[in-house]
């Protein structure tokens, strides 16, 4: 019988962290430190909005890109917090968690043989997603003496003529490292010089403590070459709602939406209604959980 399996899938090792999580989830009174998950419940006003949407029978598909109200609130939030303007109609896509955005972003941008730069330690899904997209992951080992920040020199040394995308995972899981504005400015200069693209995973953007998070998309020339990824799991304790989003150049978002519409159709409708409430009225919840 022919082997029914694809080599590139078989060669990927299952996540060790998820294995530990599955084991702990079946144990009583165990505190799991295995995955990045807040130990708070989703705030009640957000849950109530999801419940209300069900009671009103809002259980149908949304548009592929997501609810209009949600995409508009995403744009309002980014403008308010990062000073960056996006077009809700053409530059925003609501996804099933930030993880889907990583997956379809790499698939939309990478051709076979393209290299994806991945600073590590970092989220376990980056490397497998690059492989599944047909790209070649190139690891940049971050150093403790640099507080696990990515330096311009490390980035420069890793770039080749095959480099297509840099994944920028800051604030970082698992190290907790953050990038200061001066760090990002140096990184941005290298990115522009080599004409590469950035996938900026900022899912932990609300969990900084000493200083306000700065996004690379807020720097001159970076919005045009960056896919900005964020979501609701960490900031609003909504991991199980499975909702994220990405913003970027319309041409890239259009191709990501194409993959999304064939593979997913749309993100969960109930979660989208709850997320509108989170963005509109959830800032006090973020602060309460962040400082608890």
What does each of the following model-derived ranges do?
Residues 86-92, 112-115, 162, 223-226:
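Short acidic capping loops at alpha-helix termini that bridge into adjacent secondary structure
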Residues 108-130:
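Conserved PLP-anchoring active-site segment centered on the Schiff-base-forming lysine
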Residues 27, 133, 193-194:
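Helix C-cap/helix->beta junction micro-motif
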Residues 5-97, 104, 278-281, 287:
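N-terminal small-domain helix-loop-helix segment of the aminotransferase-like
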Residues 131-138:
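A short helix-loop-beta submotif of the ANL/AMP-binding
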Residues 33, 166, 201, 226-229, ...:
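Structural scaffold positions in well-ordered secondary structure
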Residues 223-291:
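Conserved core segment of the aminotransferase class I/II
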């Amino acid at each position: 019988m022919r082997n029914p399996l694809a080599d590139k899938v078989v060669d990927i090792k299952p996540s060790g962290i998820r294995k530990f999580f599955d084991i702990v989830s079946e144990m009583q009174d165990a505190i799991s430190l295995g995955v990045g998950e807040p130990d708070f419940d989703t705030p009640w006003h957000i849950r109530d909005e999801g419940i209300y949407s069900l009671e009103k029978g809002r259980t149908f598909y949304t548009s592929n890109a997501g609810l209009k109200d949600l995409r508009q609130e995403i744009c309002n939030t980014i403008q308010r917090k990062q000073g960056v303007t996006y077009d809700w109609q053409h530059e925003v896509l609501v996804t099933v968690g930030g993880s889907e955005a990583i997956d379809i972003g790499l698939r939309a941008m990478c051709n076979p043989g393209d290299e994806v730069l991945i600073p590590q330690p970092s989220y376990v899904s980056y490397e497998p997603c690059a492989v599944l997209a047909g790209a070649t992951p190139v690891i940049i080992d971050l150093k403790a003496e640099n507080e696990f920040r990515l330096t311009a020199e490390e980035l420069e040394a890793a770039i080749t003529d095959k480099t297509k995308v840099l994944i920028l995972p800051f604030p970082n899981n698992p190290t907790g490292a953050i990038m200061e504005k001066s760090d990002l400015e140096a990184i941005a200069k290298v990115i522009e010089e080599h004409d590469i693209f950035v996938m900026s995973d900022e899912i932990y953007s609300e969990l900084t403590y000493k200083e306000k998070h700065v996004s690379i998309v807020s720097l001159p020339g970076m919005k045009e070459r960056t896919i900005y990824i964020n979501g609701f799991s960490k900031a609003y304790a909504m991991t199980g709602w499975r909702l994220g989003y990405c913003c970027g150049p319309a041409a890239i978002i259009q191709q990501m939406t194409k993959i999304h519409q064939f593979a997913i159709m749309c993100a969960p409708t109930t979660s989208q209604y709850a997320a509108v409430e989170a963005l509109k009225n959830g800032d006090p919840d973020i602060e309460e959980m962040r400082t608890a």
